[in-house]
From Swiss-Prot:
Protein name: 1-deoxy-D-xylulose-5-phosphate synthase 1
Subunit text: Homodimer.
A GO term, aspect molecular function: thiamine pyrophosphate binding
UniProt gene name: dxs1
Organism: Zymomonas mobilis subsp. mobilis (strain ATCC 31821 / ZM4 / CP4)
Enzyme class: transferase
Essential cofactor(s): Mg(2+); thiamine diphosphate
PANTHER family xref list: 1-D-DEOXYXYLULOSE 5-PHOSPHATE SYNTHASE-RELATED, 1-DEOXY-D-XYLULOSE-5-PHOSPHATE SYNTHASE, CHLOROPLASTIC
The UniProt record lists the keyword DNA repair: no
Length: 649
């Protein structure tokens, strides 16, 4: 179907400047070819499909009407930008999307001058576009800044904070509200099309300004009545009153798949003398591809697929994902405790709470893209005696940090944080990596921070959280599947701040936090084979640190390796602080910390990302050998309580 279809018009387009040379009547054909190319490319690489197909015509129209890159297009999130990438000189690399050394799945300033602003997290576009618009105004330039934001992103307060400050930018700021949730049928009739084109035209806007001037000179009572009549009439016609209260001219709704509507409206908006302007564009996710239109949720993000049938490649069978283990254990806990409630921020499927909702619909709260609210809402529930589990991706928990400090930790409220997608995440790259939660959580007084080494440990930790009421507690776990351990049997309530010694050795000790335990054990096998007897501990808790176990290991080994799936400032800092405070390094103890590097790692397969960071068996062995070759000293054997024969430097 698509792979062999010809794309004669698209083949001629290397830049938007060439697109703008096309006859307007040929843009429909270009859009059809662009849709085929987008489907074909995502069929090869996988990625976000539905949202991109929904903005094909809008993307063509924006690059046709606006003088990009001089006029800045600022895309929100970036899931929908594959067609934009194809039209802006990157078609030859579009089948490298989300691959190692390939194109990003989001906009990146380093990738193209047409990517005016990087994106991946939601609801940032209007703020960034306002920055471009104000820079244009300060420079006495007429360059436009166009924010393209979806209706889902408008659930976040940041979008309204930006709009509330946007009036000063005037005509240079344009916001395109891409509404792909509304039914497209009602707003695309002849009357709606006429109204949208009329309202966006210069004569209408000038007439409205004149009438506002007249109203302002009326007696107070008449003026109020006139304004209310105007608001009522415009609200009935276009629904724009809310946005106008924020200082925007409102235009729409416009059929986002009808180029004959889109282009005249965008031209009128581009040439308007006043602003800022919001254009309400109605689109369908998956437009033009039957499988995606029929199952929008399943084609938002896809694996590689057969573009003819729409069938997606299935992942090979394996152990359950950490997310599903968390969800299933939480359901078990909630069946026993009706005080357990859950909160997520527009990610019920990603966090596994869609399953929880099937059992307890009244106890699952999806607050939209509102992490700040989610954290404080959870704090309120905890203060009222409930047991909230606040379930967020690590990368999005960053957005609620002040609330973590002010509303949870200071008040020592027993909010349970399930921090999903902790560590490196593969194809989504740096913007979605869960690199920093360890560092910013262990710094909070009262906070307990756990990380499981496998799926059974995660189930134990969820069970423990359900029974912990002394203050806030968190568990972080990665994207992907477990290691295949059994989940049968009763779950344990873990003693807070206690790790476990997995393997006894004499010379090297590996203190592992999280799912690097398997690699740590592989490294220990290799080190043992080289005559370097190695202990391995599953530390379980970054905070409170198991000081007794840590102290024993530091006193009895020559080389200490800490390993964690987080950035500088996390688990290793806890170990080093204790060692420094107690003088445990004064006699030449060698400690090496393995953690994520102090840079943003690009997209790749997870295992390669961790190997590049040195967080695999090879990296552990290399760190030990390097440490031993620097000022080595002999090792003597001592006896330690509960640990058997352990080596001491």
């Amino acid at each position: 179907m698509f792979p062999n279809d010809k794309t004669p018009l698209l083949d001629k387009i290397k830049t938007p400047a060439e697109l703008r040379q096309l006859d307007r009547n040929s843009l429909r054909q270009l859009a059809d070819e662009l849709r085929k190319e987008t489907i074909s490319a995502v069929g090869v690489t996988g990625g976000h499909l539905g949202s991109g197909l929904g903005v094909i015509e809008l993307t063509v129209a924006l690059h046709y009407v606006f003088n990009t890159p001089k006029d800045a297009l600022v895309w929100d999130v970036g899931h929908q930008t594959y067609p934009h990438k194809i039209l802006t000189g990157r078609r030859d690399r579009i089948r490298t999307l989300r691959q190692r050394d390939g194109l990003s799945g989001f906009t990146q300033r380093a990738e193209s001058e047409y990517d005016a602003f990087g994106a991946a997290h939601s609801s940032t576009s209007i703020s960034a576009a306002l920055g471009f618009a104000m820079a244009s105004k300060l420079s006495d330039s007429d360059d436009k800044a166009v924010a393209i934001i979806g209706d889902g992103s408008m659930t976040a307060g940041m979008a309204y904070e930006a709009m509330n400050n946007a009036k000063a930018a005037g005509k240079r700021l344009i916001v395109i509200l891409n509404d792909n949730e509304m039914s497209i049928s009602p707003p695309v009739g002849a009357l709606s099309s006429y109204l949208s084109r009329l309202i966006s035209s210069r004569p209408f806007m000038n007439l409205r300004d004149i009438m506002r001037g007249v109203v302002n000179r009326m007696p107070k009572g008449l003026a109020t009545a006139a304004r209310k009549a105007d608001e009522y009439a415009r609200g009935m016609a276009t629904g724009g009153t809310f946005f106008e209260e924020l200082g925007f001219y409102y235009v729409g709704p416009v059929d986002g798949h009808n180029l004959d509507q889109l282009i005249p409206v965008l031209e009128n908006v581009r040439d308007a003398k006043d602003g800022p302007i919001l254009v309400h564009v109605v689109t369908r996710k998956g437009q033009g591809y039957a499988p995606a239109e029929a199952a929008k949720d399943k084609y938002h993000a896809v694996q590689r697929l057969d573009v003819v049938s729409g069938k997606q490649a299935k992942a090979p069978p394996g152990p359950p994902s950490y997310t599903s283990v968390f969800s299933e254990q939480l359901i078990k806990e909630a069946k026993q405790d009706d005080k357990i409630v859950t909160i997520t921020a527009a990610m019920p499927t990603g966090t596994g709470l869609d399953r929880f909702q099937q059992y307890f619909p009244e106890r699952m709260f999806d607050v939209g893209i509102a992490e700040q609210h989610a954290v404080t809402f959870a704090a309120g529930l905890a203060a009222a005696g409930y047991k909230p589990f606040c379930c967020l991706y690590s990368t999005f928990l960053q957005r609620g940090y002040d609330q973590l400090v002010h509303d949870v930790a200071i008040q020592n409220l027993p909010v349970r944080f399930a921090v999903d997608r902790a560590g490196l995440v593969g194809a989504d790259g740096a913007t979605h990596a869960g690199s920093f939660d360890l560092a910013f959580m262990v710094n909070l007084p009262n906070m307990v921070v756990m990380a499981p080494s496998d799926e059974r440990e995660l189930a134990n930790m969820v069970h423990s959280m359900a029974h912990y009421d002394q203050g806030p507690i968190s568990v972080r776990y990665p994207r992907g599947n477990g290691v295949g351990v059994s989940l049968e049997g009763e779950k344990e309530i873990l003693p807070i701040g206690k790790g476990r010694l997995i393997r006894r050795g004499k010379k090297v000790a590996i203190l592992s936090l999280g799912t690097r335990l398997e690699e740590s054990l592989k490294a220990a096998d290799r080190l043992d084979a080289q005559g370097l007897s190695t202990s391995v501990a599953d530390m379980r808790f970054a905070k409170p640190l198991d000081e007794a176990l840590t102290r024993q290991l530091l006193k009895s080994h020559q080389v200490i390796i800490t390993i964690e799936e987080g950035a500088l400032g996390g688990f290793a800092t806890q170990v080093l602080t204790m060692a420094s405070d107690e003088g445990l390094m004064d006699d030449g103890l060698k400690i090496r910390t393995l953690r994520l590097p102090d840079r943003f790692q690009p997209q790749d397969k997870q295992e390669r990302q961790y190997a590049e960071a040195g967080l695999d068996a090879d990296g552990i062995v290399a760190a030990v050998i390097s440490a031993l070759h620097r000022n080595s000293k002999p090792v003597e054997v001592v006896e330690m309580a509960n640990m058997g024969s352990i080596a001491r430097a």
